[in-house]
Amino acid sequence: MPLWVFFVLLTLTSGSHCSLPPSPPFRVRRHADAIFTSSYRRILGQLYARKLLHEIMNRQQGERNQEQRSRFNRHLDRVWAEDKQMALESILQGFPRMKLSAEA
């Protein structure tokens, strides 16, 4: 058997080594799938980064708000204590008058 016939037979029988390239519609579909997948992953990455950024900003804003709330609450407590003290003093100042008016 001539050598070239042997190579032709070997080429035709071995489908894995010398397979034909995929048909164009299959390649186009694979290419479109790859474009979609890479774009989808990029968008998911951007959404994840945006979510992390919002969480960090909300955490910082929450700490600021908590600090402002505690300052505001301390101020309210101080004002309430002062009002309570003034009301108590005015009541106590009224007692001697009440005693004097009750005795008279």
From Swiss-Prot:
Signal peptide coordinates? 1-19
Record GO terms (molecular function): growth hormone-releasing hormone activity; growth hormone-releasing hormone receptor binding; neuropeptide hormone activity; peptide hormone receptor binding
* Residues that make up the propeptide removed upon maturation: 20-30, 75-104
Please report which protein family the annotation says this sequence is part of: Belongs to the glucagon family.
Biological function: GRF is released by the hypothalamus and acts on the adenohypophyse to stimulate the secretion of growth hormone.
> Where does this one sit in the cell?
Secreted
Q: What is its main location?
A: secreted
Pfam families assigned to the protein according to its UniProt record, in alphabetical order: Hormone_2
Q: Which PROSITE patterns match?
A: GLUCAGON (PS00260)
Its keywords, alphabetically, are: Cleavage on pair of basic residues, Secreted, Signal
What taxonomic classification does the UniProt entry list for its organism?
Eukaryota, Metazoa, Chordata, Craniata, Vertebrata
Question: What is the protein name stated in its UniProt record?
Answer: Somatoliberin
Bilayer-crossing regions: none
Its GO biological process annotations read:
adenohypophysis development; adenylate cyclase-activating G protein-coupled receptor signaling pathway; adenylate cyclase-modulating G protein-coupled receptor signaling pathway; cellular response to interleukin-6; growth hormone secretion; hormone secretion; multicellular organism growth; negative regulation of cardiac muscle cell apoptotic process
Which GO CC terms are listed, alphabetically?
axon terminus; extracellular space; perikaryon; terminal bouton
Superkingdom assignment: Eukaryota
